[in-house]
Amino acid sequence: MKFRPLHDRVVVKRIDAEEKTAGGIIIPDTAKEKPSQGEVIAVGPGGHDDSGKLIPIDIEVGDRVLFGKWSGTEVKIDGQDLLIMKESDVMGVLTDVFSKKKAA
């Protein structure tokens, strides 16, 4: 099944957090917090301003995004746990700065 979000909504798949700390301590499942990073799976066309003009979304499919702990609505689509949230719930897009520096 394919899901197409409406308006300014995005569908995000959480990216699991590390299971070990920097010091090598393994974090049990009960102590883990929900990850606040995810990969964008689908985006809506965007919202509309007061005059009805379409305002496109700045986020693209495949972007790695950072969002708040309580952002979005949890849904299950085709057996996958996903989040549907508004574009305004996304704090920013993560980029791989280190790989760009190595390429230069």
UniProtKB/Swiss-Prot annotation:
Taxonomic superkingdom: Bacteria
One Gene Ontology MF term: ATP binding
Annotated compartments: Cytoplasm
The UniProt record lists the keyword Cytoplasm: yes
Induction (record text): By NifA.
Keywords per UniProt: Chaperone, Cytoplasm
Chief localisation class: cytoplasm
Entry's family note: Belongs to the GroES chaperonin family.
The name this protein goes by in its record: Co-chaperonin GroES 3
Higher taxonomy: Bacteria, Pseudomonadati, Pseudomonadota, Alphaproteobacteria, Hyphomicrobiales
